[in-house]
């Protein structure tokens, strides 16, 4: 009997490991299906399953939910990378041009404080454009004219992100450091940009997709 229980536990552990292996890097729909399967199993057979199997399945369920959150975040990052590609491309060119102009002023001004301050600001702007998180709506540094009330809200969000970028720039923790940006580097496909926990403005993956779509053409908020 003990051997039978041990065999069941090993099989449950193997099945759980296999489920997790299949979920790693998978799309959200596939992971959701696996979550439903585990939930259905626990709902129907909890009274008859050994405690060890129940614990194993509950751990699997928790891990699958974490992987689902990661999958939804990756999908949102891919969507936003495509959606805001052109605006970020043009803003990077503009930020690079302004940085070079500021650098030239520093080199020709014999250490003028105002020129140095301007250069630091241009460095910050360049890092902002390149490292802005893919998991949230891009907020342009150089926006076109907009409604005054909307402009106030947008400016507040922009300032919040700039503070995060400035902090990570000073700490040397930016996903793409300034020296790499100046060499033409940008965020790779796996990176989602700066951590936005400090700005409290990250989109919740999978939430209100229709509202997100309504903003599809609003590149220059």
Swiss-Prot record:
<protein>
    <recommendedName>
        <fullName>rRNA-processing protein EFG1</fullName>
    </recommendedName>
</protein>
<keyword id="KW-0175">Coiled coil</keyword>
<dbReference type="GO" id="GO:0005730">
    <property type="term" value="C:nucleolus"/>
</dbReference>
<feature type="region of interest" description="Disordered">
    <location>
        <begin position="189"/>
        <end position="221"/>
    </location>
</feature>
<dbReference type="InterPro" id="IPR050786">
    <property type="entry name" value="EFG1_rRNA-proc"/>
</dbReference>
<comment type="similarity">
    <text>Belongs to the EFG1 family.</text>
</comment>
<feature type="compositionally biased region" description="Acidic residues">
    <location>
        <begin position="211"/>
        <end position="221"/>
    </location>
</feature>
<dbReference type="GO" id="GO:0000321">
    <property type="term" value="P:re-entry into mitotic cell cycle after pheromone arrest"/>
</dbReference>
<dbReference type="Pfam" id="PF10153">
    <property type="entry name" value="Efg1"/>
</dbReference>
<dbReference type="InterPro" id="IPR019310">
    <property type="entry name" value="Efg1"/>
</dbReference>
<dbReference type="GO" id="GO:0000462">
    <property type="term" value="P:maturation of SSU-rRNA from tricistronic rRNA transcript (SSU-rRNA, 5.8S rRNA, LSU-rRNA)"/>
</dbReference>
<dbReference type="GO" id="GO:0071027">
    <property type="term" value="P:nuclear RNA surveillance"/>
</dbReference>
<feature type="coiled-coil region">
    <location>
        <begin position="28"/>
        <end position="81"/>
    </location>
</feature>
<comment type="function">
    <text>Involved in rRNA processing.</text>
</comment>
<keyword id="KW-0698">rRNA processing</keyword>
<keyword id="KW-0539">Nucleus</keyword>
<dbReference type="GO" id="GO:0030688">
    <property type="term" value="C:preribosome, small subunit precursor"/>
</dbReference>
